[in-house]
């Protein structure tokens, strides 16, 4: 180990930065965030330093470097574009046994600055020892996505509860189980972020007073339209905290590879006209797993509240008193249109968007007259088998036969396929495509030739 990772208490302690440019400014922000009493020495300063000095946040010393500036310092940073000056600052600091960082010269420095993930009071520092800063930055970005944004507030609140938890739970095992339950409670984290004192108190009392082997909870998570990169950060955090993941066929393998390795996986794949697992049985699976005290994630393609039957599943949980929450996802209409170069709205062509299911309940009928109107975009989910009927009904109700249409298969995935034409060809085009597919109808489809970007990569 070439470097010992430590966390320094710099609040109200003298620190020095030599340099007045952009690099020095980035270092100054970190020291100011840490509460340091900061002096900055340079021949000239960018405007941000002047603004900080005017606000009383730091002291500026304009002129050549003077070693006496180090006499009261705990820590120094050399951040100029003059290697000779940086070396001089480093040697002067070392002579006084003061740790000194030299920007972009780790061998000349007595300490290095890591990449930082700040969830105060929780702090994570990542370093490659100066050998590969880009790698350290990429790793930091990965870790950023895994740590909920409000985790620091939860950690701070947990510190306030330590005494009460120690009284409430007599064994270390009970306390550990309680803390695990608290740190994954999304409702508490959100309440703390919103400073909702009533919700904070209610959630805390519920967590403390309910049995540790309580009935669990269900989180409904939208996986997005296919590309794993479109999964939200909150969705990623939820699937990596799950005990059980219940998923359907629209969830890609790339997304399932992000699920916690030791989580149970329950496949309930569905498609229009054929259900591997009946919807009622899916509802009961969620209920049974939650009643075992497990943290269940119901992972659904797209957005769970847009033709995903998420509302029906949550009604079952609500009726049984099972706690639940929802993480929205990018719906197929948004993802498929963007990856096909088709804007859903455009000032010249469409002032509204209709999201329509092509898989109606028996006896259901759409308002075809309104759907046939101009200046709008129609997006049909699960409409492949009904394409000929959609074509017929829209033309019967006045939509021009030359209206542009597109069908997007496996939208946003590397296997995405798009075919376009006119409304009079819709039924024929649908026969060339496979499920899952999305039908887009409207003048905006005509922009595809100009705006298509994904198929060119």
Curated annotation (Swiss-Prot):
The keyword S-adenosyl-L-methionine applies. The active site is at residues 248, 270. Its EC number is 2.1.1.107, 1.3.1.76, 4.99.1.4. Pfam families: CysG_dimeriser, NAD_binding_7, Sirohm_synth_M, TP_methylase. NAD(+) binds at residues 22-23, 43-44. Keywords: Cobalamin biosynthesis, Lyase, Methyltransferase, Multifunctional enzyme, NAD, Oxidoreductase, Phosphoprotein, Porphyrin biosynthesis, S-adenosyl-L-methionine, Transferase. This is Siroheme synthase. GO terms for biological process: cobalamin biosynthetic process; methylation; siroheme biosynthetic process. The gene is cysG. Pathway: Cofactor biosynthesis; adenosylcobalamin biosynthesis; precorrin-2 from uroporphyrinogen III: step 1/1; Cofactor biosynthesis; adenosylcobalamin biosynthesis; sirohydrochlorin from precorrin-2: step 1/1; Porphyrin-containing compound metabolism; siroheme biosynthesis; precorrin-2 from uroporphyrinogen III: step 1/1; Porphyrin-containing compound metabolism; siroheme biosynthesis; siroheme from sirohydrochlorin: step 1/1. Then it catalyzes the NAD-dependent ring dehydrogenation of precorrin-2 to yield sirohydrochlorin. Finally, it catalyzes the ferrochelation of sirohydrochlorin to yield siroheme. It catalyses: uroporphyrinogen III + 2 S-adenosyl-L-methionine = precorrin-2 + 2 S-adenosyl-L-homocysteine + H(+); precorrin-2 + NAD(+) = sirohydrochlorin + NADH + 2 H(+); siroheme + 2 H(+) = sirohydrochlorin + Fe(2+). It comes from Shigella boydii serotype 18 (strain CDC 3083-94 / BS512). NCBIfam families: cobA_cysG_Cterm, cysG_Nterm, PRK06136.1, PRK10637.1. S-adenosyl-L-methionine binds at residues 225, 301-303, 306, 331-332, 382, 411. It comes from the Bacteria. Residues 216-457 are annotated as: Uroporphyrinogen-III C-methyltransferase.
């Amino acid at each position: 180990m070439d470097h010992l990772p430590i966390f320094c208490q710099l609040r109200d302690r003298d620190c020095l930065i030599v340099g007045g440019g952009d690099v020095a400014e980035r270092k100054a922000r970190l020291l100011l965030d840490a509460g340091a009493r900061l002096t900055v020495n340079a021949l000239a300063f960018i405007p941000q330093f002047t603004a900080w000095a005017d606000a009383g946040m730091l002291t500026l010393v304009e002129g050549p470097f003077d070693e006496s500036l180090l006499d009261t310092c705990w820590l120094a940073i050399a951040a100029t574009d003059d290697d000779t000056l940086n070396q001089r600052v480093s040697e002067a600091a070392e002579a006084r046994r003061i740790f000194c960082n030299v920007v972009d010269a780790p061998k000349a420095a007595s300490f290095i600055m890591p990449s930082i993930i700040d969830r105060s009071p929780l702090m994570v520092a990542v370093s490659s020892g100066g050998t590969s800063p880009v790698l350290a930055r990429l790793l930091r970005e990965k870790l950023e996505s895994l740590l909920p944004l409000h985790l620091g507030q939860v950690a701070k609140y947990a510190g306030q509860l330590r005494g009460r938890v120690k009284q409430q739970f007599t064994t270390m095992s009970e306390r550990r189980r309680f803390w695990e339950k608290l740190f994954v409670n999304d409702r508490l984290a959100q309440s703390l972020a919103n400073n909702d004192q009533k919700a904070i108190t209610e959630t805390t009392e519920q967590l403390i007073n309910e049995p540790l082997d309580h009935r669990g909870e269900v989180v409904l998570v939208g996986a997005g339209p296919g590309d794993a990169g479109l999964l939200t950060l909150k969705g990623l955090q939820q699937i990596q905290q799950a005990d059980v993941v219940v998923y359907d066929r629209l969830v890609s393998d790339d997304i399932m590879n992000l699920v916690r390795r030791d989580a149970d996986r329950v496949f309930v794949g569905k498609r229009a006209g054929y259900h591997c697992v009946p919807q009622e049985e899916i509802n009961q699976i969620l209920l049974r797993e939650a009643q075992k005290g497990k943290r269940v994630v119901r992972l659904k393609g797209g957005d769970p509240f847009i033709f995903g039957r998420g509302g029906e599943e949550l009604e079952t949980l609500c009726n049984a008193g099972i706690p639940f929450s929802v993480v929205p996802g990018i719906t197929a209409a948004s993802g498929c249109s963007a990856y096909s170069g088709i804007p859903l709205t455009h000032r010249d062509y469409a002032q509204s968007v209709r999201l329509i299911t092509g898989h109606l309940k028996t006896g259901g009928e759409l308002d075809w007259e309104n759907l046939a109107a101009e200046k709008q975009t129609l997006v049909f989910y699960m409409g492949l088998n009904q394409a000929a009927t959609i074509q017929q009904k829209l033309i019967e109700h006045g939509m021009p036969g030359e209206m542009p249409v597109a069908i997007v298969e496996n939208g946003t995935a590397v296997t995405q396929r798009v075919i376009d034409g006119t409304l009079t060809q819709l039924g024929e085009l649908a026969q060339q495509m496979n499920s899952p597919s999305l039908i887009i109808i409207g003048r905006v489809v005509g922009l595809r030739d100009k705006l298509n970007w994904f198929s060119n990569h």
